[in-house]
Amino acid sequence: MKFAVYTKWYWQNGVPTPAELQTNMNKAVSGDTSAEDVIWWKIDENHHQSLIIYPSEKIAEEELGKRQVKREKSRADNNIELVEEFMGPIMSRLTEL
């Protein structure tokens, strides 16, 4: 069963532009995860949210340590704070990811 990890982040200096966020994602995430998809979106001037879709809970748990290391680096590099995080199995979806 696919597994989702949702987070909300606070950017003290404001959420960067979409191009800057894409560059950040490419550096921090691309090629270094078993996630099927990672989606980031802006909700206001100082917050963004993210959704990571994993093939299974087991894989999400296996990558937890790696996610934590990347988060610490991102906090230091970008002056951001994790506001909330929720995880759970995907129960239904409209499309195949």
Go through each PLM region and give its residues.
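Short S/T/G/P-rich N-terminal loop/turn motif that feeds into the first structured element of a domain
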Residues: 1-49, 53-69, 76-97
